[in-house]
């Protein structure tokens, strides 16, 4: 959540942020009104309690005639205090409810607009000219099926659309990617973590996934647990309700977990293959830093993502995501998009988000610097979302005979294998 003091002091900045996100600007005024009600009801409660305490001291000293009147007044004050307490609680709950609906403040350098209004910051690698090489590229599903690596037919039979099996070299390729990603993250100073896939509502709400993103979250209603769409959620909640020493920051974790997404609103989009699925595995980087270090940490996360994609020998571009496509928690987000030959365009493989103190305030994660205690900043970045990375590798490194060249970086994790070759049917 944002700092309420900032809302009170500069509401126009918050309105501008909501407008840039394409969200309801009237929410800001509703929150301001609720905050004023909360504060005024708090003042009234304190005044009545003070009057009640003062009256309580007078009653023992009063004459019999005065005491009867004072007791009558005390009875009325008791009712007034109780009513004021209820009013204060209701006003406080309303303000909290509205505050949780408000997205993070958009960074001033973020391009304003919707999904297509991003700005390309960098391009890396060379896009292959398959025409010059003399063959038509196959898509990842055709390649994967020929390699005995992907089985979507049985995935659909068992679980429905957007499910799949990784088999044979497909399974080995996932394990190689995960081990390589964890190795890179560990070398960079991240602590590897295997995280829960089920979390309580507070963890999901605290990370900002129960607002505009809630339609994509799986909820186990009977037990009131949520399936995570990213290990960002359990990693952000790992230090919930804790105060961390400033001299121990930054604290960096690399989480590996299954991820579950309903993909609501994507009917008919990316239905072929494993690019957009309901369940996948992912290695996620997560950082806790001092607020003043957040922007530099954001750049570091992006550099680690670029290192990863460069190591996989993939052509990719880096974009500055537009304000309407940020998600509730991020103040700024950089995506790395790999070139997908059969689609003829770049597609998102990684995201790096600066959430500044938004998640930390909601989850009560703070830092102590001397005598000062304050919310810290959290950031997250995808290192390897497995299915999409497999899509990019298969399509970009395919050869005319349907085999796929293994990037040199991955070979030690595949027993030195240089090629993935089609299997006999």
UniProtKB/Swiss-Prot annotation:
It catalyses: tRNA(Ser) + L-serine + ATP = L-seryl-tRNA(Ser) + AMP + diphosphate + H(+); tRNA(Sec) + L-serine + ATP = L-seryl-tRNA(Sec) + AMP + diphosphate + H(+). GO terms for cellular component: cytoplasm. ATP binds at residues 261-263, 277, 348-351. Keywords: Aminoacyl-tRNA synthetase, ATP-binding, Cytoplasm, Ligase, Nucleotide-binding, Protein biosynthesis. Pfam families: Seryl_tRNA_N, tRNA-synt_2b. Its EC number is 6.1.1.11. The keyword Signal does not apply. It is found in: Cytoplasm. InterPro entries: aa-tRNA-synt_IIb, aa-tRNA-synth_II, aa-tRNA-synth_II/BPL/LPL, Ser-tRNA-ligase_type_1, Ser-tRNA-synth_1_N, SerRS_1_N_sf, SerRS_core, tRNA-bd_arm. It is an enzyme of class 6 (ligase). Pathway: Aminoacyl-tRNA biosynthesis; selenocysteinyl-tRNA(Sec) biosynthesis; L-seryl-tRNA(Sec) from L-serine and tRNA(Sec): step 1/1. It comes from the Bacteria. L-serine binds at residues 230-232, 284, 382. GO terms for molecular function: ATP binding; serine-tRNA ligase activity. GO terms for biological process: selenocysteine biosynthetic process; seryl-tRNA aminoacylation. Coiled coil: none annotated. Homodimer. The tRNA molecule binds across the dimer. Consists of two distinct domains, a catalytic core and a N-terminal extension that is involved in tRNA binding. Catalyzes the attachment of serine to tRNA(Ser). Is also able to aminoacylate tRNA(Sec) with serine, to form the misacylated tRNA L-seryl-tRNA(Sec), which will be further converted into selenocysteinyl-tRNA(Sec). Belongs to the class-II aminoacyl-tRNA synthetase family. Type-1 seryl-tRNA synthetase subfamily. This is Serine--tRNA ligase 1. It comes from Streptomyces avermitilis (strain ATCC 31267 / DSM 46492 / JCM 5070 / NBRC 14893 / NCIMB 12804 / NRRL 8165 / MA-4680). The lineage of its organism: Bacteria, Bacillati, Actinomycetota, Actinomycetes, Kitasatosporales.
């Amino acid at each position: 959540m944002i700092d309420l003091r900032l809302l009170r002091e500069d509401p126009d900045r918050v309105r501008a942020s909501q407008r840039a996100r394409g969200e309801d600007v009237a929410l800001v005024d509703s929150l301001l009104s609720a905050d004023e009600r909360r504060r005024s009801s708090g003042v009234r409660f304190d005044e009545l309690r003070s009057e009640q305490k003062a009256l309580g001291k007078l009653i023992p000293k009063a004459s019999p005639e005065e005491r009867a009147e004072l007791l009558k007044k005390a009875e009325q004050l008791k009712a007034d205090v109780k009513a004021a307490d209820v009013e204060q609680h209701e006003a406080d709950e309303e303000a909290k409810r509205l505050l949780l609906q408000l997205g993070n403040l958009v960074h001033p350098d973020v391009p304003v607009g919707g999904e297509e209004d991003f700005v390309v910051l960098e391009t890396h690698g060379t896009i292959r000219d398959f025409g010059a090489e003399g063959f038509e590229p196959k898509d990842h599903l055709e390649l994967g099926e020929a390699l005995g690596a992907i089985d979507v037919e049985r995935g659909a039979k068992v679980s429905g659309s957007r499910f799949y099996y990784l088999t044979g070299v497909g399974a080995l390729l996932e394990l190689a990617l995960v081990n390589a990603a964890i190795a890179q993250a560990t070398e960079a100073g991240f602590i590897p973590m295997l995280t829960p896939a089920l979390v309580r509502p507070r963890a999901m709400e605290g990370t900002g996934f129960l607002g505009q993103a809630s339609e994509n979250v799986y909820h186990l209603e009977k037990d009131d647990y949520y399936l995570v769409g990213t290990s960002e959620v359990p990693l952000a909640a790992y230090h919930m309700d804790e105060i961390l020493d400033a001299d121990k920051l930054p604290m960096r974790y690399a989480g590996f977990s299954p991820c579950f997404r309903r993909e609501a609103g994507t009917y008919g989009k990316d239905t072929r293959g494993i690019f957009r699925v309901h369940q996948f595995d992912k290695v996620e980087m997560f950082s806790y830093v001092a607020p003043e270090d957040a922007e530099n940490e954001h750049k570091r996360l992006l550099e680690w993502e670029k290192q990863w994609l460069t190591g996989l020998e993939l052509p990719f571009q880096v974009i500055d995501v537009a304000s309407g496509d940020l998600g509730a928690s991020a103040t700024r987000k950089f995506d790395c998009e790999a070139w997908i030959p059969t689609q003829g365009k770049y597609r998102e493989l990684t995201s790096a988000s600066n959430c500044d103190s938004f998640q930390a305030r909601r989850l009560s994660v703070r830092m102590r610097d001397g005598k000062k205690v304050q919310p810290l900043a959290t950031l997250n970045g995808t290192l390897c979302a497995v299915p999409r990375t497999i899509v990019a590798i298969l399509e970009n490194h395919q050869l005319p005979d349907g085999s796929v060249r293994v990037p040199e970086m991955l070979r030690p994790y595949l027993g030195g294998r240089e090629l993935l070759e089609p299997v006999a049917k």
